């Protein structure tokens, strides 16, 4: 398989010229090592903490480890040898060289606190997700996403028209690099192996989860709640565990970057807002496998298709902003009357409200809900309805129907 250019490369190279250490986090198998090896020069040493001998040396004698594996260096799965962080700090303090040490880590559950305590001010931290639809298509947009009609029109000129069959092919296939272009049998075997080896092993190491049968049932339970508010009682029932255990297991999956929780919007001026997050899978292909959707067509025509489409759009937004120049805050809005807005994109104190609909011609009256923003001292920016329409269409001066392939 040919190398697929990752959108994170631009940001990584920029931070590499500024920080002495760069850490790229993300779930197992999303392409962290592949990307960094692609960017590394021939003089950069590579070592993985999956190697037992290298890991034992790193844990027992970090000084000797760096004498053996000299910087500039790429250390894979560094969370398995947290003993290295103190020595990395010493190396950074003794050198002015930027980009000296590259790290990857796939378990954020316990690692990040140690990293921030030890390497504050010395390390740049980035997150890589599985392949986005844009990356798979080789698309690069010249304009930042601001949801204005002009920006959407500029993006539309670079892409083919939205196609529901292609969208659900991507949703069903997912973005794991190793399943791109493989047949159905190999895809199923890949995800089965991914759960039984990587996921189960990491869940045991990080969260002490040892019951493989209940853990798989819990994963299936999570897949059944995709794009819905988290319900710990329902998750607990799916795996015959206590709700408190379900909360712990979900936190493990969030730390392993299998699950993404979209926080609810909070504002002191707007009363009685929900505080419960919504549940999404970082990779829709894994979610579809767990729910036994055997083909893209059955998923597209199935009862859960709208939920999967929402999951797809939310994660495309997450990926877009994870790799973008500016930072934003992504939330959703829901009040005690069940009035809900699927996504708030908050940037520079401006809120861009977005609804997500699988339809190619959703009801334009959906945007009336956005007036709730005006009840507080908030600035409402451009927004709209992300859907399966084939080109951007203005709804009013501030909102558009937005083709989902433009995000």
PLM feature spans:
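Conserved catalytic/switch belt of AAA+ P-loop NTPases
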Residues: 86-109, 116-117
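Short glycine-rich substrate-engagement loop in P-loop NTPases that contacts/grips substrate
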Residues: 44-72
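Conserved P-loop NTPase "ATPase switch" module shared by AAA+ and STAND
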Residues: 68-84
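A cross-kingdom feature that marks ATP-driven nucleic-acid transaction machinery
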Residues: 1-29, 33-49, 71, 251-252, ...
């Amino acid at each position: 398989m040919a190398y697929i250019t990752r959108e994170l490369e631009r940001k990584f190279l920029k931070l590499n010229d500024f920080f002495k250490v760069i850490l790229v986090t993300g779930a197992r198998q999303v392409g962290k090592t592949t990307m960094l090896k692609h960017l590394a020069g021939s003089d950069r040493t590579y070592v993985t903490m999956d190697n037992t001998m290298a890991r034992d040396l790193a844990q027992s004698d970090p000084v000797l480890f760096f004498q053996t594996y000299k910087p500039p260096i790429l250390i894979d799965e560094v969370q398995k040898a947290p003993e290295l962080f103190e020595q990395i700090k010493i190396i950074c303090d003794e050198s002015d060289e930027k980009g000296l040490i590259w790290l990857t880590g796939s378990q954020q559950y316990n690692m990040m606190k140690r990293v921030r305590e030890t390497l504050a001010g010395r390390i740049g931290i980035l997150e890589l997700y599985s392949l986005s639809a844009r990356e798979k298509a080789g698309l690069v947009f010249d304009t930042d996403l601001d949801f204005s009609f002009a920006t959407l029109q500029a993006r539309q000129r670079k892409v083919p028209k939205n196609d529901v069959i292609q969208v659900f092919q991507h949703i069903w296939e997912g973005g794991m690099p190793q399943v791109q272009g493989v047949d159905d049998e190999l895809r199923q075997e890949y995800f089965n192996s991914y759960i039984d080896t990587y996921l189960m092993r990491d869940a045991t190491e990080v969260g002490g989860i040892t019951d493989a049968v209940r853990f798989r049932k819990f994963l299936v339970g999570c897949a059944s709640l995709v794009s819905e508010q988290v319900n710990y009682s329902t998750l607990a029932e799916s795996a015959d565990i206590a709700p408190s255990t379900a909360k712990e297991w979900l936190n493990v999956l969030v730390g392993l970057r299998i699950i993404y929780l979209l926080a609810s919007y909070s504002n002191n001026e707007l009363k009685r807002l929900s505080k419960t997050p919504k549940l999404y899978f970082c990779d829709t292909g894994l979610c579809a496998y767990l729910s036994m959707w055997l083909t893209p067509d059955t998923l597209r025509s199935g009862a859960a298709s709208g939920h999967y489409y929402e999951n797809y759009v939310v994660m495309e937004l997450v990926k877009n902003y994870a790799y973008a120049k500016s930072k934003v805050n992504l939330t959703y809005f829901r009040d005690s009357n069940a009035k809900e807005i699927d996504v708030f994109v908050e940037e520079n104190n401006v809120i861009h409200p977005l609804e997500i609909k699988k339809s190619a011609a959703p009801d334009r009256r959906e945007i009336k809900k956005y007036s709730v923003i005006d009840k507080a001292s908030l600035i409402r920016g451009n927004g709209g309805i992300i859907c399966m329409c084939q080109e951007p269409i203005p709804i009013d001066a501030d909102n558009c129907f937005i083709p989902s392939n433009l995000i």
